[in-house]
A protein has these predicted regions:
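Residue-level recognition of specific faces of alpha-helices
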Residues: 11-14, 25, 36, 61
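Alpha-helical interaction/regulatory segments in DNA maintenance proteins
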Residues: 3-6, 46-74
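Beta-strand-rich cores of mature extracytoplasmic or soluble domains
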Residues: 78-91
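Eukaryotic low-complexity, proline/serine- and acidic-rich intrinsically disordered regions
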Residues: 32, 50, 89-91
Length: 91
């Protein structure tokens, strides 16, 4: 799939922690660019993907989205940040 001459989702795959499966899932819920992901934020993006793909989505994906936007590898994310993200995702 192409959008404005670019392969859709490729830009998302350039982010740390995100690969082709994550990119396809984000695209499926309408998030096709880094800018769209930044605007929506990791929690809302996670919730959309989790609603669309409940059996394929774990809390690790939430951490991956957060880390992707901050350029932080999953292994370097603090337990405090993870707890805050989980609380926000629960609403």
């Amino acid at each position: 799939m192409r959008n404005n001459g670019k392969v859709q989702g490729f830009e998302l795959e350039s982010l740390k922690n995100l690969g082709p499966v994550s990119s396809r899932q984000l695209q499926a819920v309408g998030i096709e660019t880094i800018e769209q992901l930044e605007t929506m934020g990791p929690v809302q993006a996670f919730q959309l993907v989790a609603n669309q793909f409940p059996s394929e989505t774990s809390v690790t994906f939430l951490y991956a989205l957060h880390g992707a936007l901050l350029d932080i590898p999953l292994g370097e994310m603090s337990d405090q940040d993870k707890a805050r993200l989980r609380d926000q995702a629960r609403g």
